[in-house]
From Swiss-Prot:
It is an enzyme of class 4 (lyase). The gene is mtnB. This is Methylthioribulose-1-phosphate dehydratase. The lineage of its organism: Bacteria, Pseudomonadati, Pseudomonadota, Gammaproteobacteria, Enterobacterales. Keywords: Amino-acid biosynthesis, Lyase, Metal-binding, Methionine biosynthesis, Zinc. Its cofactor is Zn(2+). It catalyses: 5-(methylsulfanyl)-D-ribulose 1-phosphate = 5-methylsulfanyl-2,3-dioxopentyl phosphate + H2O. It comes from Sodalis glossinidius (strain morsitans). Pfam families: Aldolase_II (PF00596). GO terms for biological process: L-methionine salvage from methylthioadenosine; monosaccharide metabolic process.
Length: 200
């Protein structure tokens, strides 16, 4: 039953179309030393508990004979960096992917949306929500290093975008991570549509 909530979240993500063509990966902290993460190449809308494998948070070592998701290093970094994090969700939605490419700077700044309050600690729509945008890379260790350097300057909150790739977000548990994902996806779609209207 430990993975039941995460399995349900993965199926919900699949139904939303936020992880098409087996894209994305989802994980849950198992204990201080390890996490469960989706096996590579599986449809996230049809997962069950057997589709997750255990990965060591410090070393990234996985169960022999099974291949963890490509971005496993991002998940294990977040579990090391934030001991309070209990779940990480990485998705490939259209709005997150488009906005990550359209954003000219290294940070997507959102303000004026009531749904900003879906993010833990946000209490006012006038406050700015800053989501870091990183260049995509197939070199995950190098990407993790860049993310860690940026985090040392401006601590990450809620999630970050990878250009042309998608969103990675997290929470203290599956429920909070799912709430952050849904809130951010709503905000991204609003911002995308706002920019389209202003460009006309």
């Amino acid at each position: 039953m430990q993975l039941a909530e995460l399995v349900a979240a993965c199926r919900w993500i699949g139904a939303k179309g936020w992880s098409p063509a087996t894209g994305g990966n989802m994980s849950q902290r198992r204990d201080v030393h390890s996490c469960y993460i989706t096996e590579s190449g599986l449809d996230k809308g049809h997962l069950d508990a057997g589709d997750f494998l255990t990965v060591d948070i410090q070393t990234g070592a996985a169960q022999p004979g099974r291949r963890p998701s490509a971005e496993t290093g991002l998940h294990t970094f977040l579990y090391r960096r934030f001991p309070e994090v209990g779940c990480v969700l990485h998705t490939h939605s259209v709005s997150a992917t488009v906005l990550s490419r359209a954003e000219q700077g290294s940070t997507l700044r959102l303000s004026g949306y009531e749904m900003q309050k879906s993010l833990t600690g946000q209490t006012d729509h006038r406050e700015e929500v800053a989501i870091a945008v990183f260049d995509n890379s197939q070199d995950i260790p190098a990407l993790v290093q860049r993310i860690a350097l940026q985090d040392a300057l401006t601590p990450l909150r809620y999630g970050f975008l990878m250009c042309g790739h998608g969103l990675t977000c997290w929470g203290r548990d599956v429920r909070e991570a799912r709430l952050h994902l849904e809130g951010l996806e709503f905000l991204f779609e609003c911002e995308w549509r706002r920019r389209l209207l202003e460009a006309q």
